Amino acid sequence: MNYNPLHLLPLPPTALDPKPIPTSLTLDPFSDVLWVGASSGIVSALCSPLTLARNVHFPAHGCKIGGGGFSAQGVSAVREVRVTDRDVWTLTEGGIGGRKRGGAPKWIVSDVTRSLRTMSPNPTNSHELITGGSGSLLLANTARGEVVRSIENSSPVVKLAPLHRTVLAAGLSGQVTVLDPRTGFKAAQNISPVQAHTGGLSGADVQGNIVATWGWTHMQGHPLPDPLIRLYDVRALRPLPPISFSSGPAFVLLHPSSSSHIVVSSQQGMLQTIDMSLGPSATVFQQLDVSSYITSMALSSRGDYLAFGDGDGQLHVWTTNETGENAAVDENGSIVLPPFNGYDGVKPEWPDQVDPLPTIAWEESTPLNLVGMPYYNEALLSQFPSECYATSTSPLFNPPATIPQPVLSSMKMVDFVGYAPNPKELRGKRYVLRAVPGAEGRARGKGRRDSGPRFRSEKDKKGTYKDKEEIEEELNDGEVPKYYRKVEIKYSKFGIEDFDFEFYNRTNYSGLETDILNSYTNSLLQALHYTLPLRAIATAHICVDCKKEHCLLCEAGFLFRMLEDAKGRNCQASNFSRAFSATSQAYALGLMDENTNSKSTAPYGSLIQNFNRWLLSTFSTESIVDGETFHLRPFPQKTSGLDGLSMNDGPSAIDQVLGVKIKTTNTCRHCGFVSSRDSTLHVVDLVYPKKMNPRLSFSDILRSSLIRDSTTKAICSSCKAFAPLDSRRSLSPSSGHPLPPVLSVNAMVTNSDVYGFWKDKKDVKEKDGVRRFLPKRVTIREVGKLENGQEEGVKYSIRSMVVQIQESPDAVAHLVSFVKMPSKDGSSAWIMFNDFLVRPVSEDEVLSFPDQWKVPAVIILERENAEELLNLEVLPKELDREILFKDVSIAWNRKQDMIKHKILQREEMPKRGTLVAIDAEFVALQQEEMEFRSDGTKNILRPSHMSLARVSVLRGEGEMEGKPFIDDYIHTSEAVVDYLTEFSGIKAGDLDPNNSPHTLVPLKVAYKKLRLLVDLGCIFVGHGLSKDFRTINIFVPPEQVMDTVLIYTLPGSQRKLSLRFLAWYLLHQDIQTNSHDSIEDAHFALLLCKLWMDYASESEEAFEIVMEDIFAEGKKLAFKPPSSAGNMMAEQQLSPVSFPPLSNGDQTVARAVVKSRMATPPPPTKLGLPQWASQNSPSPLRR
């Protein structure tokens, strides 16, 4: 295998190094790129073996050249370059750094000792990198950009290389060792180190299971280059036959694709290509064209390219491919060579080409806005704040009133200025000039529409906004009120917690957020929630043993319970949306909202009506569990079950509330055969006459939609002829209750002609001069009463309504619901739900349809005697407590040693006030969407979609205090885009029933356990619980939450302390060193809570002093535990009171000051909790 010269390229000089030399070369196995690290600290990417065009050029971290956030720490050569499929890692003696392939920096880690020489990725953790040199080995976290552990090493390290599950370490002393990450990178117990070279080791290379080393030997007490290349099998470091190289090896490269080939070079450029399988006869000798010495060498992934650098600053590229007369050429006669990485992998990414400036034909009629805006970094004059010019006296927004005629008649002009006396009839207080009411408000409203919604961070110290803008505004005729417009959640730098939902909702009724998939269902869910019989069935359904994983009725029951408990706080239907999205039938019916664009003009009115029809039918099916359902009305039944359930002889519970009993009679015109069948309608679709009749009322159209005649052609079941069939649909007389307590109606307004029935009409006979189509009450007469001519019938009143809002045909459409809230005194108030905007409205406004911007979609009617017809007392009110005593898992391969919890005993049943510690871990189902502005700032459009992956709940009291009784991993069938292993500890396969070794349960099972603990009145202890509960999609009353994030804070400070910092400072424990563990986090949150309770029971002043000391120390350490703390913890077993002093003198003094002010807690008990946490002293919160 001969290599032929292809390129000779000198490295460009720099200001700090006029003659840089190549010190590290890497031929990219993933892309057609040669990475060159130079003695100047510059890293360059050269693309294509034919051109070596420069693609990327940046300084490595640790060199003196700054930029991109990299510090200047002295001139340092690039010692190693490693490439992954996404990133580029560089190493100098001063530190390591990671960048994207395009050169953008991602992380840096500095070494103050400036002793680094080599690095290797951790084969068991993709976020960790181990480096070494003359000092200790450092384990760096590439996600956080910090050293997480320091590992003592007896000898300087020359080379680190990743193996299958271990790391190879070649020491300067000549010893080769295999390090095991599972034991803290100590020497592997089953593989003994070997002494490869007696005089020291120069380097090593690894490919597959083969290790090649070269170095020095001793002869008569003097070091000489060892002529033997040592080979070892890495599986046991078993020596293989060595290879002789008399010139003294300086670089040895194992062929990546052929394990029998080795490329060896001496310092002077003597090159040998050795085939170990064929022996010395197959060895190829070549002399590299260098006049000095070889400084670096690299081999491509296929072995067909060889790159090396020399001491004169030249970069050489040789190849085994033909480059002479026999070389392959293209149609233009140019030589064709394969890429550096072969024909696999990805193409190098080049920067976007700058678009040429457009040519403008400049004429007198050319508008000035054809000239684009330049990039700017300060406010433009056009951003002049409105409050500076749109004041109450501004002539721009407050045009002057017309001057009265008496003033004009007596006015005299002097130098273009008019003067006139004020007549007596225009004098008095009522003629004093005043500001036009609402003018300044209109200006602010216009500005607010451009600037976005409210954030809590915009409030002043008094908790109010600087201006007094309200959602209400003055309107012109035909203008859509502001509170009807589509609302969106915006994200500030503080996240979703900074968004002020209270600005949009000042009622006791909770709204629903919009940033979830299929959020168009929010309006109907609100309408169904305030339909009390349906709410009662849904909340009772969660109390039975429903085994369907994605049960919409269960999720609706959980959502309705959350809306009940929240009492005005914002909620989200994320779990309902997740179950809905997992339903294949909904996909087939086209019920999914595929329009993720916020400017979509989708017809949501039609979509919500189809969803209403399908959802109620699904509810009806799901309300029957194991053949049993609730009997709320008197129906014949044979056998009664337990807890209000009975055998399914009659209709389902949903049918009893919403089902319309219909009888359809078909008569064949050909043979006269009559057939009939009974069915149940859950939704009535309104059918309008072809010609508009202004005399028709809503009751007439509803009656004609229930009882109607039609003609169709079909095959007669009697005569088998394809003949016309006369079909008549009517209320079933055989059913005792043809009309249900609740009637769901789809408006079916599909065009402007149909909307003509609904549009308000002027009528002087009405009080306000407007006749509305939708009445407050509707009367429907049943079949028997119709035949007898009686006027009485079933009376319904409107309970709720869903309408579509669309300001214009090309505007964004969305849905709004109106709900009539009953009260104990008999009065009722109407509430509008525009997602998370909730406000009261008048009944006339609800029933009014002034124009096509407001179109009805779903109307829910409730019988005025519904409470008398339904016996809701048979419904269960409490969840089954047995779920806390069952050990449920759907994992096929659960391992006993992975079970870390012990389920509750019956005598441990929690009660009101019982302390439990909780923590949860999550995975990402969808990455966040954001936009980057030209000034470098970013705006989050949609946050990442997180899903519960693990939840752990620990006992907070009793003999087994601190022991988990829930440790459930959550089965996730959706595609996971990021397991967030570093932060969650969740790995691929942990959430799969076929592969998970843990306790794996469906989301609904874990949710039921948490829901039961909330209902029992438990007090939840944890750190950052608001985010956890939000993602779990459960509302816990504030009086049942003890969040250490809120406990350990200073009044008026925005800083939230991390659990790791608090545990390090107060409990003297270093946690979360490798990844997060929910049991560990919950345990330490419980310890911190108990510590706070201990301080609070003694003196509030003592706790305030401790908090001041914590923040003072945190400012010195950037609120991060020193990395040295982890090293000290690993060296010795410490109790909370034996924490050693830190190396820094100031930190030692600060620690001593804090200790002097703190009451030192006693040593830990056998359960790991301090004795003060085990005492039966009453909690200060329970007092």
From Swiss-Prot:
Free-text remark on how the cofactor is bound: Binds 2 metal cations per subunit in the catalytic exonuclease domain.
GO molecular function, one term: nucleic acid binding
Bias type Polar residues, positions: 1172-1183
Top-rank EC class of the record's enzyme: hydrolase
Positions of the Exonuclease domain: 916-1085
Required cofactor names: a divalent metal cation
Keyword Nuclease: yes
Keywords, comma-separated and alphabetical: Cytoplasm, Exonuclease, Hydrolase, Metal-binding, mRNA processing, Nuclease, Repeat, WD repeat
WD repeat residue intervals: 150-189, 289-328
Protein EC: 3.1.13.4
Function comment: Catalytic subunit of the poly(A)-nuclease (PAN) deadenylation complex, one of two cytoplasmic mRNA deadenylases involved in mRNA turnover. PAN specifically shortens poly(A) tails of RNA and the activity is stimulated by poly(A)-binding protein PAB1. PAN deadenylation is followed by rapid degradation of the shortened mRNA tails by the CCR4-NOT complex. Deadenylated mRNAs are then degraded by two alternative mechanisms, namely exosome-mediated 3'-5' exonucleolytic degradation, or deadenylation-dependent mRNA decaping and subsequent 5'-3' exonucleolytic degradation by XRN1.
Family as reported in the entry's similarity comment: Belongs to the peptidase C19 family. PAN2 subfamily.
Subunit structure: Forms a heterotrimer with an asymmetric homodimer of the regulatory subunit PAN3 to form the poly(A)-nuclease (PAN) deadenylation complex.
UniProt domain comment: Contains a pseudo-UCH domain. This ubiquitin C-terminal hydrolase (UCH)-like or ubiquitin specific protease (USP)-like domain is predicted to be catalytically inactive because it lacks the active site catalytic triad characteristic of thiol proteases, with residues at the equivalent structural positions that are incompatible with catalysis, and it cannot bind ubiquitin. It functions as a structural scaffold for intra- and intermolecular interactions in the complex. The linker, or PAN3 interaction domain (PID), between the WD40 repeats and the pseudo-UCH domain mediates interaction with PAN3.
UniProt protein name: PAN2-PAN3 deadenylation complex catalytic subunit PAN2
